[in-house]
């Protein structure tokens, strides 16, 4: 049976999440930024990275696995490169701070490449590349995650969902934004299905026997997109956001749930490009706007109403949710309203949140 869904205004949801995170121990400015990030995800229909995450974050914060007064340090290693040392702060705050250094270098030198070293989970990568595009930059972001995807031809999880996000500015109201896991689906989508008691497609994941499953509670390994192609991409992400920063790789990356009293030491990488160093900025943006226009004019295939550019459906969903309210599972809403910081559900679970 599916769970009841309620609809909240974005400011109400944002405030509920901020209050809970502050109660867990996060300082006000950090809690506000995380709540803003999670609201962005829920608005765009990516509920796997929205309010469903608050209880996990709160449990980790309360148990000491997130540095609540981090000693942030930016180490500039070259004219266009640097490493942001995050001190295992909550990743949403650390990654946004690191992004600002990268954007500054890209504005000055044409390119900015910043690695984020030793941080917590940073949420939805499209949040960051959206900011870059709003500042007239092209952006690529990659981030390692804990091992839950089986390699092509294998049966045991090795790499994470290892997402990739891309953005570019246009002369339209919104930029092009593309964000994807290198697995068929992100783990958070399965977590969202669990919270709503919904089945998943049998192409997303396998159980402990390596067989396809439709039960979100039986997932033991996620599948890479397009077999060997996704496998190669997730390895690339692991190299760029892990090994390149001297951090653990593959199956050695810490699990999200294994010990919530210690930092996760995750890595992330931003590559930011200033188009004006390669071409006229306005011509570049005009060309991308024309590209979108021509994609919209492409004859849709049977069963499709229109051809959309990558990420456009998220823009449409955001407009719908701003008008009609953000859908939230009743259990999540009840938790946000409760006096409980967390229900002690995640600590010492496996990668799939199972005890």
Q: Which residues does each PLM region occupy?
A:
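Catalytic-core signal marking the mid-to-C-terminal active-site face
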Residues: 4-8, 13, 23, 249-355
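N-terminal glycine-rich anion-binding loops that anchor highly charged ligand groups
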Residues: 8-10, 26-50, 66-77, 261-265
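Active-site cofactor/substrate anionic-group-binding motifs, chiefly glycine-
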Residues: 50-103
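A generic, well-ordered mixed alpha/beta core segment in the N-terminal half of proteins
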Residues: 81-171
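Glycine-rich phosphate/pyrophosphate-binding loops
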Residues: 136-148, 242-256
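Phosphate/diphosphate-binding glycine-rich loops and adjacent basic-rich segments that engage nucleotide
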Residues: 149-216
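Small-residue-enriched flexible segments
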Residues: 187-249, 258, 263
């Amino acid at each position: 049976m599916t769970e009841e869904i309620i609809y909240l205004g974005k400011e109400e949801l944002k405030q509920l999440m901020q209050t809970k995170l502050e109660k867990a121990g996060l300082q006000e400015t950090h809690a506000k930024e995380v709540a803003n990030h999670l609201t962005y995800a829920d608005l765009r229909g990516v509920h796997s990275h929205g309010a469903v995450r608050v209880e996990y974050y709160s449990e980790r914060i309360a148990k000491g696995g997130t540095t609540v007064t981090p000693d942030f340090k930016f180490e500039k290693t070259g004219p266009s490169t640097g490493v942001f040392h995050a001190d295992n702060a909550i990743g949403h705050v650390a990654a946004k701070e690191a992004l600002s250094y990268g954007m500054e270098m890209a504005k000055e030198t044409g390119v900015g490449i910043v690695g984020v070293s030793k941080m917590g989970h940073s949420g939805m990568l499209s949040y960051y590349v959206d900011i870059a595009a709003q500042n007239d930059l092209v952006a690529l972001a990659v981030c390692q995650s804990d091992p839950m995807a089986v390699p092509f031809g294998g049966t045991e999880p090795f790499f994470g969902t290892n997402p990739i996000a891309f953005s570019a500015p246009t002369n339209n109201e919104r930029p092009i934004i593309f964000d994807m896991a290198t697995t068929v689906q992100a783990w958070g989508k399965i977590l969202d299905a669990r919270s709503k008691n919904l089945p998943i497609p049998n192409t997303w994941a396998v159980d402990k026997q390596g067989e396809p499953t439709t039960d979100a509670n039986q997932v033991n390994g996620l599948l890479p997109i397009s077999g060997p192609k996704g496998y190669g991409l997730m390895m690339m992400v692991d190299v760029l956001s892990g090994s390149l920063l001297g951090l653990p790789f593959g199956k050695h990356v810490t699990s999200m749930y294994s010990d919530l009293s210690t930092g996760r030491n995750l890595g992330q990488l931003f590559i930011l490009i200033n188009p004006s160093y390669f071409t006229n900025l306005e011509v570049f943006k005009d060309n991308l706007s024309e590209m979108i226009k021509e994609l919209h004019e492409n004859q849709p295939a049977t069963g499709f109403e229109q051809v959309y550019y990558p990420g456009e459906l998220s823009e449409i969903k955001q407009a719908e949710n701003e008008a009609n309210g953000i859908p939230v599972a009743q259990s999540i809403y009840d938790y946000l309203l409760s006096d409980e910081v967390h229900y002690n559900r995640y600590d010492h679970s496996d990668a799939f949140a199972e005890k």
